[in-house]
UniProtKB/Swiss-Prot annotation:
GO terms for biological process: mRNA processing; RNA splicing; tRNA processing. Keywords: Chloroplast, mRNA processing, Plastid, RNA-binding, tRNA processing. Usually encoded in the trnK tRNA gene intron. Probably assists in splicing its own and other chloroplast group II introns. GO terms for molecular function: RNA binding. Signal peptide: none annotated. Belongs to the intron maturase 2 family. MatK subfamily. One of its GO terms (cellular component) is chloroplast. InterPro entries: Domain_X, Maturase_MatK, Maturase_MatK_N. It comes from Nepenthes distillatoria (Pitcher plant). This is Maturase K. It holds the Pfam family Intron_maturas2. Its main location: plastid.
Length: 504
C-alpha cells in the first residue's frame, strides 16, 4: 500500500480531488496502453519512470484542434478519411489515458477502506456465478419480482454531472466532456443507440467506468430506502453496490431526503426486499403483495425522472409472480417451482403419509435462444440440425477439434448449474456432429465413412463432461462425489458469459 501511495504521488492532488497532474504524466499513457482493459496496476509492480511530460498531451490536443476536416477539399475523400481517422486516434489515446486516471482515486479509496481486512483482493475473485447461489437462497421464499431494464442517459452531459459528484477537478471534467463530444461529433449521423455501441467498442474501459457510475447512481436509492425503515446500517452495502466510494453520495441523500420521505418510506417498509443486477438488467424481489410492487415500480420511474433527468417508461419495468413466470437472466431461464415430496411417518402400529411441497429455484438452459445463437454462428440451421462450418475447414484436424471442444467445454462449464440438462445435451450433440461434418467436409468424405474409419471415440477426449472432470479430482467411492454427480455445480471461476461470436 505504501508503494502504491508513493508511486502515484497523489498527496495534495489526492486531498483536493485534482487529477490534472496525473494527466500530464507520460507513464500513465504507457500503462493504459500496455495493461489493456482487463489488467490493473493496483496489485502489480509497474516499472515505469516517474517523469512528467507536458508536451505529449499538449501536442495531441493541439493536433486534434488543428485537424479541421471541414475545410478540406470535398473531392479528396481518401485524405479526409485518413485525417479523420488520425484525429479520432488522438482522441482515443487521450480518452484511454483519462479512463486509466479517473479510476485511480476510486480504486485507492476502495483499497484504503479495506486495508487490514482479509478481503483486500476479493474484487479480483468475484464471479458472475456467485449470483446464482444468492438467488437459490433468497428467491425461493419470495413472491413477486420487478424485472427492470436500467435506462440509458439521454444526454452526454448527464454522465459528466455524475462524475462531478466525486471530483472537484474542473480540468478533468472538461477533458471528459471533450472526449465524449468528440466521439459524438465524428459520428453525428448515427443514432444514440448506435453511438453507445460505437463508443463502447472504441474505448471499453472509459465506457464501462461511465456506465458503472451511471448505474450506481440509480442503485444508491436502494441502500437509502433499506436503511431508513430498519434504522440500521447495512453491513453488506459495499458488496451490494460493489463499490464503496458512493458512501458520500448516500449520506448526502439521507441528510437531504430524510424529512421529506417519511410518509413514502412507510409504504416501502419491507424486510424481505432483495436486489440483484447484471449489466443493464436488474431484479427487485419481495415477499410482499402485488400492490407493494406497483408502488415500487412507479416510485422508481418518478424518482429517476425527477432526480436524474432520465426518461424511464413504466413499460420497462415488469411485475411478475415468481411462481408462474420465468426470468431471463444471464443466459438462464430461472423460475421458482414447487418440488413435491412424500414423507412416510411410522408411529407405533400406525403409519402416516404426509405430502409436502418445497419451493426450489429452478434454472434451465434456454433452448430456442441457444439454437438461434448456434444458427447465427453457422453450427446448425434455424431448426437445430447440425451443419459443417466451412470457414474452419482450412485448419488442421487438431485445431478444428480443439475449437469445437473448447466451445463445448465452456458451455458445459457455464451451464453446469442447470437443473434440467436435456437442452445442454442437445447443444453438445450439435457441436459434436458439426465438428464431425466439418472434418468430413475437409477430407471430402461422408460423416458415416469418416467416423467408421477413425471411430467415434476420437471426440470423447475433447468433449469430456464435468462429471468426468470431477472423477479425476474426487474419489469414486466418496459420498461427496456421488452427490455432486447428481446435483448442480456452480463453478465460481467463471467471470464472463461465453460468446459464440468470438469464435467466428
Amino acid at each position: 500500500m505504501e508503494e502504491l501511495r508513493g508511486y502515484l504521488e497523489l498527496d495534495r492532488s489526492w486531498q483536493r480531488d485534482f487529477l490534472y497532474t496525473l494527466i500530464l504524466q507520460e507513464y500513465i499513457y504507457s500503462l493504459a496502453h500496455d495493461h489493456g482493459f482487463n489488467r490493473t496496476i493496483f496489485f502489480e509492480n509497474a516499472g515505469y519512470e516517474k517523469k512528467y511530460s507536458f508536451l505529449i498531451v499538449k501536442r495531441l490536443i493541439t493536433r486534434m484542434y488543428q485537424q479541421n476536416h471541414l475545410i478540406l477539399s470535398a473531392n479528396d475523400s481518401n485524405q479526409n478519411e485518413f485525417l479523420g481517422q488520425k484525429k479520432n486516434l488522438y482522441s482515443q489515446m487521450i480518452s484511454e489515458g483519462f479512463a486509466f486516471i479517473v479510476e485511480i482515486p476510486f480504486s485507492l479509496q476502495l483499497l484504503f477502506s479495506l486495508e487490514g481486512k482479509e478481503i483486500v483482493k476479493s474484487r479480483n475473485l468475484r464471479s458472475i456465478h456467485s449470483i446464482f447461489p444468492f438467488l437459490e437462497d433468497k428467491f425461493s421464499h419470495l413472491n413477486y419480482v420487478l424485472d427492470i431494464l436500467i435506462p440509458h442517459p439521454v444526454h452526454l452531459e448527464i454522465l459528466v454531472q455524475t462524475i462531478r459528484y466525486w471530483t472537484k477537478d474542473a480540468s478533468s471534467l472538461h477533458l471528459l466532456r471533450f472526449c465524449l463530444y468528440e466521439y459524438r461529433n465524428w459520428n453525428s449521423r448515427i443514432s444514440r443507440k448506435q453511438y453507445i455501441s460505437f463508443f463502447s467498442n472504441r474505448n471499453q474501459r472509459l465506457f464501462l467506468f461511465l456506465y458503472n457510475s451511471h448505474v450506481c447512481e440509480y442503485e444508491s436509492i436502494f441502500i437509502f430506502l433499506r436503511n431508513q425503515p430498519s434504522h440500521l446500517r447495512s453491513t453488506f452495502s459495499g458488496a451490494f453496490l460493489e463499490r464503496i466510494y458512493f458512501y458520500e453520495k448516500i449520506e448526502h441523500l439521507v441528510k437531504v431526503f430524510t424529512k421529506n420521505f417519511q410518509v413514502i418510506l412507510w409504504f416501502f417498509k419491507d424486510t424481505f426486499m432483495h436486489y440483484v443486477r447484471y449489466q443493464g438488467k436488474s431484479f427487485l424481489a419481495s415477499k410482499g403483495t402485488s400492490l407493494l410492487m406497483i408502488k415500487w415500480k412507479y416510485y422508481l420511474v418518478n424518482f429517476w425522472q425527477c432526480s436524474f433527468s432520465v426518461w424511464s417508461q413504466p413499460r420497462r419495468i415488469y411485475i411478475n409472480x415468481l411462481x408462474n413466470h420465468x426470468l431471463d437472466f444471464m443466459x438462464f431461464l430461472s423460475s421458482v417451482r414447487l418440488n413435491p415430496s412424500v414423507v412416510r411417518i411410522q408411529m407405533l402400529e400406525k403409519s402416516f403419509i404426509i405430502d409436502n411441497a418445497i419451493n426450489t429455484f429452478d434454472t434451465r438452459v434456454p433452448n430456442i435462444p441457444m439454437i438461434g445463437s448456434f444458427a447465427k454462428a453457422k453450427f446448425c440451421n434455424i431448426f437445430g440440425h447440425p451443419i459443417s462450418k466451412p470457414v474452419w475447414a482450412y485448419l488442421s484436424d487438431s485445431d478444428i477439434i480443439d475449437r469445437f471442444g473448447r466451445i463445448c467445454r465452456s458451455l458445459s462449464h457455464y451451464y453446469s448449474g442447470s437443473s434440467r440438462k436435456k437442452s445442454l445435451y442437445r447443444i453438445k450433440y450439435i457441436l459434436r456432429l458439426s465438428c464431425a461434418r466439418t472434418l468430413a467436409r475437409k477430407h471430402k468424405s461422408t460423416v458415416r465413412t469418416f467416423l467408421k474409419r477413425l471411430g467415434s471415440e476420437f471426440l470423447e477426449e475433447f468433449f469430456m463432461e464435468e462429471e468426468k472432470v470431477l472423477s479425476l479430482i474426487l474419489p469414486r467411492d466418496s459420498y461427496t462425489s456421488q452427490r455432486l454427480y447428481r446435483g448442480r455445480i456452480w463453478y465460481l471461476d467463471i467471470f464472463c458469459i461465453h460468446d459464440l461470436a468470438n469464435h467466428e
